[in-house]
Structure formats: structure tokens, C-alpha cells
Amino acid sequence: MAPTVDIKNLIYPWLIEAEEYSFNDINDGIRLHLNESPFPPPDFIIEEVKKYLHLGNRYQHPSLLERLRELMAEYNRVEPKNIYPTPGGDGALRAVFYNLIQTGDKVVINNPSYSMYKVYASVRGLKLTRVNLIENDNWWKMNFEKFLDEAKNARLVIIDDPNNPTGSPMLKAEEDKVRALAESINGFILIDEAYYEFSGYTVAKLINKYPNLLIVRTLSKAFSLASYRVGYLIGNEEVIKNLMKGATPFDISLPGYIAGITALENPSYVRKIVEEITKNREYLLNGLRKLGLKVYNSLTNFVFVKDERDLLSPLLNKGVAIRKPIIGYYRISVGTKEQVDTLLKYLGEIIENGNSK
């Protein structure tokens, strides 16, 4: 007879208590809840990927990794040795959480911020400190002095810039603030620039000046490659070299490599996507404000709305998904002009009919 084992006793308590990433999804309808691009990848990427689908029985050749690093470095005006390609931006976050910090270490983030920071911290058994953002008219801003004070005994600080879910700039690549953090912390500074293509600012030029500075990037948003799972870390050569030792073999799929390489060889299409989404974002902002909703300015592909009513459920019933990251606030991804019009129409009906009470 097999010995009786309470399996929970074999699992670390912090993993049992860890939080999960959760959201409401829809199979059909208008998806404005995951900050995806509403535009599919251009045909030239799809056609290039198709050429390699018959090689599904083979692992990826190392030359693909080398080429992707070269292109990512060129795109960011750094060296390939400063680039670590990962399966999406979340792969970059995982690399940091699982290799540069250990159970019991302190991590400091803004509140609110990207929800996966909290998930990774709880799964790893880390001490998480959250510093509340400050509402500033139609924007949100960091409480930088408090954040800096908390950073002094932290192993890792993470700043998503622009911030998710508020869409507001945080450090805005101001070197004085980066320097202050770099000099205060006995650990790493991780700047999550997932929305760099929309904000236009970056701290990439500072990685050699501040060797404990790391940057997360993704091709999921402006490049329209979310399901291909291509992201990367930018950092000091020594940090990147050692992080890559922990990479699993072939962790980016062959279609991901081909899509990423083809996109970065032809990046001009991204500018058109960013321009269209930016135009639609301003259209969405104005439309929401005309409905009487409190909505904040944004430097991303989403907007942040303050409202105590239940807007989530009635919109889901109409086939439109948005996100409610915290109580009393909604995050709405920017869609096509047609999707924005549909959303505004439904929201107007919901508010007028009082179904959101």
C-alpha cells in the first residue's frame, strides 16, 4: 500500500497561497481587454511564417537566435550582447524573477501596475511592497520620494513606464531619477517598456552607465505579434550573459523567430499601426468624455476609466470585453474605429438605461 502523503505538505506554502492571473474572456466579439493590437500582422510576415510551418518536426537553428539579437540590437541602438530574446515580455519578467532574486527578497512596484508582477512575486515567495500612484488631474504620477525610500533595502524595483493600467508616464526616461534609484538600491532596476512604441521614450541608452538597469520589451503590442510570443530584455552585457544561461533550449517557437525577424527587418509598418491606434485612442477618449465618464490621458494603446458602476457585465452580455483591474476603475484597449464606435454606442445605451447600477 502506498504511503499516505498530504501532498500540500510537499508544496511551498507561498506557492499554495500565490495569486493567479485571471480575466474574463470571450470567444467571439470585440476584445478590448488584453491590450492586443486590433490589427493583424501584415501579409508579408504571415507569408514568411508559412514557409517554415513544414519544419515543425525540427528544432530551431541557433542562427535564428543570433539574427534576432542582431535586429533587436539595431532597433534599440545597442549591441547584440545587450539583448536577451524571450518568449514574450512575460518571458523576460520570468527570467528576472527566477534568476536574479530569491525567496524572501524585497520587491518594490507601483500600485497599480501590471498584475503579473504581483503574481510572480507571490509564486516566488517574495516580499512585495506597493507604492500608491498619485492622481494628478487627467494623469497619474509616481510618489517618487516614497518609492526611492522603499528601494533602499530592495533587491528589485519594477516600474512599468508608461504605467499599466493608467497609461501615464512614470520616470519618462529622466536620468536623474534613474541615477537616484541606481545609487540607492543594492539590486536591480527593471523598467518595463512594453508600450515604448507608443510613448516614444526609453532608458536603453543608459544600460552601460547603470549596469543594474534592465529593460523589458515586447513585440506583442505595436508589432501585432501577441500570439507569436516574442519579447526581450535589454541590459548590461554581464547580466545578459548570465541570465541567458538559465534560458530553456528553443523557448521561442520557430514561427515566433520568423515573425520577429521578419518584423524587425521591415519595422516601418509599426509606425502606421502606432499612428492609427493613437488616432483611435484620442477618438475613444473624446467619446468616453462625452458620455460623462472620467477618463485619463494615455501614452499607450489603452485608456483608464474611473467609474463605480458595473460596466463590465452589461458589455460582456453585448459581446464586448474590457478589463476591471481594480475596484472602481476600467481599462479599455484601443480598437479599430468601428470597434470604438460599437463600444461607445453600447456604453451610451447602458448608461442611459441605468443597467449599470
Curated annotation (Swiss-Prot):
GO biological process: L-histidine biosynthetic process
Pfam families: Aminotran_1_2
Pathway(s) annotated for this protein in UniProt: Amino-acid biosynthesis; L-histidine biosynthesis; L-histidine from 5-phospho-alpha-D-ribose 1-diphosphate: step 7/9
Catalytic reactions of this protein: L-histidinol phosphate + 2-oxoglutarate = 3-(imidazol-4-yl)-2-oxopropyl phosphate + L-glutamate
Source superkingdom: Archaea
UniProt KW Electron transport keyword: no
Cofactor dependence: pyridoxal 5'-phosphate
SUPFAM superfamilies xrefs: PLP-dependent transferases
InterPro entries: Aminotrans_II_pyridoxalP_BS, Aminotransferase_I/II_large, HisP_aminotrans, PyrdxlP-dep_Trfase, PyrdxlP-dep_Trfase_major, PyrdxlP-dep_Trfase_small
Residues spanning the signal sequence: none
GO MF assignments: histidinol-phosphate transaminase activity; pyridoxal phosphate binding
Residues found modified as N6-(pyridoxal phosphate)lysine: 221
Alphabetical keyword list: Amino-acid biosynthesis, Aminotransferase, Histidine biosynthesis, Pyridoxal phosphate, Transferase
Enzyme Commission code(s) on record: 2.6.1.9
Enzyme class: transferase
Family as reported in the entry's similarity comment: Belongs to the class-II pyridoxal-phosphate-dependent aminotransferase family. Histidinol-phosphate aminotransferase subfamily.
UniProt-listed PANTHER family: HISTIDINOL-PHOSPHATE AMINOTRANSFERASE (PTHR42885:SF2), HISTIDINOL-PHOSPHATE AMINOTRANSFERASE-RELATED (PTHR42885)
Annotated protein name in UniProt: Histidinol-phosphate aminotransferase
Source organism of this protein record: Sulfurisphaera tokodaii (strain DSM 16993 / JCM 10545 / NBRC 100140 / 7) (Sulfolobus tokodaii)
Source organism phylogeny: Archaea, Thermoproteota, Thermoprotei, Sulfolobales, Sulfolobaceae
